[in-house]
From Swiss-Prot:
NADP(+) binds at residues 131-135, 228, 251. Pathway: Metabolic intermediate biosynthesis; chorismate biosynthesis; chorismate from D-erythrose 4-phosphate and phosphoenolpyruvate: step 4/7. It comes from Synechococcus sp. (strain JA-2-3B'a(2-13)) (Cyanobacteria bacterium Yellowstone B-Prime). Keywords: Amino-acid biosynthesis, Aromatic amino acid biosynthesis, NADP, Oxidoreductase. Involved in the biosynthesis of the chorismate, which leads to the biosynthesis of aromatic amino acids. Catalyzes the reversible NADPH linked reduction of 3-dehydroshikimate (DHSA) to yield shikimate (SA). PANTHER family: BIFUNCTIONAL 3-DEHYDROQUINATE DEHYDRATASE_SHIKIMATE DEHYDROGENASE, CHLOROPLASTIC (PTHR21089:SF1), SHIKIMATE DEHYDROGENASE (PTHR21089). Shikimate binds at residues 22-24, 69, 94, 110, 230. GO terms for molecular function: NADP binding; shikimate 3-dehydrogenase (NADP+) activity. Pfam families: SDH_C, Shikimate_dh_N. Its EC number is 1.1.1.25. This is Shikimate dehydrogenase (NADP(+)).
Length: 288
């Protein structure tokens, strides 16, 4: 698309609350322009009480697909006509597409985005995931699909850890106070907690890290440290990891690749310019 909207322009979008700071519109519209596709990706702020009406409305106006972000990733499940098995396992949907017979299907491209930077890793790498919330569920599913393991999850909520083990019995859960015992065995560390995130307009979170430098020093030499946070870039966790000789991976990779997977799905499997999406996201981040 050349930037001009016509009567035949197709709509894609994002629903969430809020959506003002999302990088997705910049990423998707840059890719669509580079591909010459007559589509426009629009963010739609949708309050929880309006979710059902919004999902029906998007179908009514012929939207060709949409992403789902906080706080709707779980709440949207009963509103969909079909849910892919991996999304059902994770208990969350972030990408919705229309079924040929009508209605909506949901999948979870967060899993695809998460695994992309890890493709090529040997199987059986001991993995420790920090956090037991929704992001941890996508990370667990991704690690298991890659054949990594043992996969351990460290969290502070016994109930959340129990729920994870009920979904994935092969995953070992660890009380946060005991995680130091497992660091020396860890070759892949994944942070799914929000600790260290910088929110626009607020200094809170700057300088924070879920693990100390001393704890990072206990990791297996040359470990991979993957922080799902991408603001600031690098995060304190990744900066310290790099200084200690570990391999850092930014959460921006997950964001870009989940978006690319979703866009390809909406466009019938066409290849998507990932680098264009990455550059658009980085440019948008530089404005924050």
């Amino acid at each position: 698309m050349d930037g001009r909207i016509s009567g035949s322009t197709q709509l894609l979008g994002l629903i969430g609350d809020p959506v003002a700071h999302s990088l997705s519109p910049a990423m998707h519209n840059a890719a669509l322009a580079a591909m010459g596709e007559n589509y426009c990706y629009v963010p739609f702020p949708v309050a929880p009480k309006h979710l059902a009406a919004a999902v029906a409305g998007l179908a009514a106006i012929g939207v060709r697909g949409f992403n789902v972000t906080i706080p709707h990733k779980q709440a949207i499940l009963p509103l969909l006509d079909q849910i892919e098995s991996r999304a059902a396992a994770v208990g969350a949907v972030n990408t919705v597409y229309p079924l040929p017979e009508g209605g909506w299907a949901g999948t979870n491209t967060d899993i695809d985005g998460f695994v992309q930077p890890l493709l090529g890793l040997e199987k059986g790498i001991p993995t420790l995931i920090l956090g037991s919330g929704g992001a941890a569920r996508a990370a667990i599913q991704g690690c298991l699909e890659l054949g990594l393991g043992p996969v351990r999850v460290a969290g502070r909520s016994p109930n959340s850890l129990l729920a994870l083990q009920q979904t994935w019995p092969q995953v070992e859960t660890v009380n946060w106070a005991e995680l130091n015992c497992y660091l020396s065995q860890t070759r892949l560390l994944v942070n799914t907690t929000p600790v260290g995130m910088h929110k626009p307009g607020s200094p809170a979170g700057q300088g924070l890290s879920p693990l100390s430098r001393e704890q990072l020093g206990l990791l297996s030499p040359g470990a991979i440290v993957y922080d799902l946070i991408y603001v600031p870039d690098p995060t304190p966790l990744l900066r310290m990891a790099a200084e200690l000789g570990h391999t850092p991976i930014s959460g921006l990779e997950m964001l870009v690749h989940q978006g690319a997977k979703a866009l390809s799905l909406w466009l019938g499997g066409k290849p998507v310019p990932v680098e264009v999406m990455r550059q658009a996201a980085q440019h948008q981040l530089a404005q924050v």
